[in-house]
Regions:
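Short acidic/polar active-site loop segments enriched in Thr and Asp
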Residues: 39, 105, 219, 410-411, ...
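Conserved core of the sugar-phosphate nucleotidyltransferase
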Residues: 471-552, 559-566, 582-615
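Short phosphate-binding loop-to-helix
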Residues: 419-482
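N-terminal glycine-rich phosphate-binding loop and ensuing alpha1 helix
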Residues: 369-417
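A short, N-terminal amphipathic alpha-helix
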Residues: 28-40, 395-413, 428, 432-433
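Catalytic cores and adjacent flexible loops of soluble metabolic enzymes
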Residues: 1-368
Length: 615
């Protein structure tokens, strides 16, 4: 099967669970694949315990659909009698062992297992073609597995398969731009790109969309097959019936035989015939959404993630202080919980609570060093020495440090300033406040964050900008708790006043940004990278209070200092630990204070600013 990665236009006939747990129905599907002229049939081999936890809402369904090892042997032998190659979806150790026993020709890892690093590595070492589903994946997840495999030279037979299924799957749930973009990003690693089409089988587009994907560079097309759509066997929604599948195979083979990277419209006309060509032209002329730029995760991708993604669970009882290994972790669907945490980020971490067999593994059950990193320097284009300006007798940076030190969930507070002598005073203040100090790059703020985190061995970073001195430490503690439970790449506080937002993220996230930013200088605008869910999984925490949207609690101008002076004069002398919520209530009754600086402009990114990542 090595030629599969060198020949564009291969079709994989996906039987999925269309057999409904009946070996005889599966044989009929195999007959249909053979009749169509496709060369590869794919089976979904699994036992229920590989897919879901006991008691999961789909537990009984998977039991009804699962075939035995002997039945898979029978089905595979039958397919080979029909001169078909056999691929198998792998969902865990059991299905991998069965597939190896069957000596299948290739594997696929479903997108639900994309975070199961060890399983993918183990399957890849069999040195067979390996399709990896990446539908509904954040790019950081794809980048994580490809770079992991690349380090051990296992990318050469990898084919990434974009495509999602949401029952029914609308046309605009697919992105052909995704195919081109994945080729650009991951072909340098040696990986190829395919396309898993899930358009409703009763739509003419079900024939045409894969043809366009081929012209975009897809090597393989995966397409669901059924006998007769009217019978409505399981998984029929995205499937073509027997006769239509044969027609589809004929289209693809004729286009592929032209040996043209980009077929012309006259090529399509000669292959499709007059009537189908008219439908094809209409599709192309009305498919602009399929070629839209990739900027954020679509609602369909988010829906797909909720339906399919597995979470890490304990393979056995884990005591306190246990250092995790791959043997301690399995991935299963868990009702109501979606932990987007790859297994290679769990390895080596120690448990801080007991974790029972089958219990979800999340950061809050593991040792994590969490540091609040305050970024500050004295030189500023808009307000020089703003960190040293005094409000009620104390430097603004001192007020900020005092508030952050009240956070109960932080293991340490670090002032990350520059190596420029002008910032010596900031280092002295940090030492007086008994917090840690890191001095680094003058202009590369993201690098300063990263190097400070590495110096003090942080697992998780709380991003704190030095000109936002009225942080809500209570909300910040709540956000840290949420971050450790949800295990997203990034947790942000939102619906807070200007100057009160925080981001919490793992140290490896900022490393990805630094190494892969298209324009390195733009990493200064770190929040725009962090909160792009095309790249990273995001979790949000909101306060339970309201506020006047004109309130501005950041420092960029002298008017900001003047406004904050009024706030501190009202609260600080009677209660130095005053809460942000009390400030917001007071400002509601004193709008004249808000007016002091409400007309000052907040520094938003220019719409032309390039904050893309090469992942």
């Amino acid at each position: 099967m090595s030629e599969i990665t060198n020949t564009m236009g291969t079709i994989i006939a996906e039987t999925a669970c269309g057999h409904e747990g009946d070996i005889n129905k599966l044989k009929l599907l195999i007959d249909a694949v053979s009749f169509s002229g496709a060369k590869i049939v794919k089976f979904q081999i699994f036992e229920p315990a590989e897919r879901v936890t006991v008691g999961h809402s789909e537990w009984d369904s998977f039991h009804k659909l699962a075939l035995t090892k002997d039945e898979w042997v029978e089905a595979t032998n039958y397919a080979r009698e029909k001169k078909l190659s056999v691929f198998a979806d792998i969902y865990g150790e059991w299905s991998h062992k069965v597939a190896k026993h069957l000596n299948v020709d290739g594997y696929k890892i479903h997108s639900e297992d994309l975070l199961n690093t060890k399983l993918i590595e183990k399957v890849a070492t069999d040195n067979k073609i390996l399709l990896i589903g990446v539908g509904g994946a954040h790019r950081s997840e794809i980048f994580n597995i490809i770079t992991h495999l690349d380090k051990i030279n296992l990318c050469k037979k990898i084919i990434l398969m974009p495509g999602i299924q949401v029952f029914p799957t609308p046309i605009d749930a697919h992105s052909l731009t995704e195919v081109e973009d994945l080729i650009q990003k991951y072909s340098p690693f040696g990986a190829k790109i395919g396309f898993a089409d899930h358009v409703s089988g009763d739509n003419d587009v079900a024939f045409f969309l894969p043809l366009i994907a081929l012209s975009k560079g897809a090597f393989i097309i995966e397409k669901h097959i059924t006998i007769n759509r009217a019978d409505k066997w399981i998984d029929y929604q995205s499937a073509l019936g027997k006769d239509d599948f044969k027609k589809f195979v004929n289209f693809v083979e004729n286009i592929s035989n032209l040996n043209k990277p980009i077929p012309t419209m006259s090529d399509y006309q000669s292959v499709l015939g007059k009537d189908d060509f008219k439908k094809f032209v209409n599709f192309v002329e009305n498919s602009s959404n399929l070629n839209k730029p990739i900027s954020a995760m679509s609602k369909y991708e988010k829906q797909y993630r909720k339906m399919f993604k597995k979470v890490p669970v304990a393979k056995t009882d884990l005591p306190v202080g246990k250092e995790l290994t791959y043997d301690d972790i399995v991935y299963k669907k868990f009702d109501g919980i979606k932990i987007p945490l790859a297994s290679n980020y769990l390895i080596g971490k120690k448990t801080k609570t007991t974790i029972s067999l089958g219990e979800v593994i999340s950061y809050d059950k593991l040792e994590n060093k969490i540091g609040g990193i305050i970024i500050a320097r004295c030189k500023s284009n808009r307000l020089a020495n703003k960190s040293l300006k005094k409000i009620v007798g104390k430097e603004t940076i001192t007020h900020l440090i005092e508030r952050i030190k009240r956070c109960k969930k932080l293991d340490c507070v670090i002032l990350a300033t520059t190596a420029d002598p002008s910032d010596d005073a900031l280092e002295e203040i940090a030492k007086q406040q008994n917090i840690l100090v890191y001095r680094g790059s003058v202009n590369n703020i993201a690098l300063r964050f990263y190097e400070a985190a590495k110096k003090y061995d942080l697992d998780q970073i709380v991003r704190i900008t030095g000109d936002n001195i009225l942080r809500d430490e209570v909300l910040l503690d709540t956000a840290i708790d949420s971050h450790l439970k949800q295990c997203c790449d990034v947790t942000s506080t939102k619906n807070v006043p200007a100057g009160c937002r925080n981001e919490i993220f793992a140290t490896h996230i900022i490393e990805k940004i630094l190494k892969n930013a298209v324009v390195k200088e733009n990493t200064e605008y770190l929040e725009y990278f962090l909160t792009n869910d095309r790249y990273f999984s995001n979790n949000y925490v909101e306060p339970d209070y309201s506020f006047n949207e004109n309130i501005r609690l950041t420092i960029d101008y002298q008017a900001d200092i003047d406004m904050l002076e009024k706030v501190f004069e009202n609260f600080y002398f009677t209660n130095p630990s005053f809460a942000l919520v009390d400030v917001l209530k007071w400002l509601d009754d004193n709008s004249d204070i808000i007016n002091i600086n409400k007309l000052q402009k907040i520094k938003f990114k220019n719409s032309e600013l390039d904050v893309r990542l090469e992942i």
